[in-house]
Design a protein with these regions (language model features):
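Asp-based, Mg2+/Mn2+-dependent phosphohydrolase catalytic module
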Residues: 2-25, 53, 137-145, 158-258
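Conserved phosphate-coupling serine/threonine residues in phosphotransfer and NTP-handling enzymes
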Residues: 32, 154-156
Length: 258
């Protein structure tokens, strides 16, 4: 087995004609490890309905979706919007702002959103909602076999991310998770990527980063990782990943060898 920095196992990452030696794979969570629509689409619909039910407001719950980049009617998200690229705190603040702008007092809006989030999270069927992107489980398995470290950097809260990974049966293959609550500046700032690399004891220059948003790509670029790979489920999302070195549609296009 080849050895990389500080004697750690080194893998060879192949994507089409691109070949890179890596000590770690770093993944975004939502839209990269897990299908975004399945995980957050239903959650967003439930959240907006629950929020509307908690305040004296005659508006359409679906209209609040515009504040987070969620089209409830077409069941589609904006890959550049808060739901896709923002932290949970930012998403909740955006919904509360939408309520406030429609006439709900700010303190009531905040209370309604916080309570709705707790209620929805408690009622979600997480095993059904957490659908790994095609090929990602095989890639993680190959990483474990090759001794290549795996990290996750997410705009979600760390505890929620750990729960999601555990429910999906992936937690044992991930060496470190950095959520938005563990850093002072989230993606596109490089801080989360640097933090996960420190936790994995690898240099960013020896890591590959996979992400589905422009924030992911820019964070990896600024952190100085060896290769930034965009994960684009649709042409619309691919158009936002122009700063990536490579763009894939799923992980069946990725090969990791010892």
């Amino acid at each position: 087995m080849a050895l990389g920095q500080k004697g750690t196992p080194m893998g060879t990452l192949r994507i089409a004609d691109s070949v890179h030696s890596v000590d770690a794979l770093v993944f975004d969570k939502d839209g990269t490890l897990f299908d975004f629509q399945t995980l957050w689409g239903g959650w967003a619909d439930l959240l907006l309905r629950e929020v509307a039910a908690r305040v004296d407001w005659a508006g359409d719950p679906g209209s609040l979706g515009a504040w987070i980049g969620w089209d409830a009617e077409r069941h589609r998200h904006d890959p550049a919007g808060p739901l896709a690229a923002g932290s949970m705190a930012e998403v909740l603040a955006a919904v509360a702002t939408g309520l406030y702008r429609s006439g709900v007092p700010w303190h009531q809006a905040k209370e309604a959103v916080a309570g709705a989030r707790r209620a929805v999270d408690a009622g979600v069927d997480w095993p059904s909602a957490l659908r790994p992107v095609a090929g990602v489980v095989a890639l993680l398995t190959d990483a474990v076999s090759a001794g290549v470290a795996v990290g996750v950097v997410t705009a979600d809260d760390t505890a929620a991310a750990l729960m999601h990974l555990g429910v999906a049966g992936l937690a044992g293959m991930v060496g470190a998770v950095i959520g938005a609550d563990l850093v002072s500046a989230g993606k596109p700032d490089p801080e989360p990527v640097h933090a996960v690399c420190r936790a994995l004891r690898v240099s960013p220059e020896r890591a590959a980063l996979f992400g589905d948003t422009a924030s992911d790509v820019r964070a990896g670029r600024r952190a100085g990782v060896t290769v930034v790979v965009g994960v684009a489920a649709t042409g619309e999302s691919a158009a936002l990943l122009t700063e990536a070195d490579l763009v894939i549609t799923d992980f069946s296009q990725v090969l990791l060898e010892p």
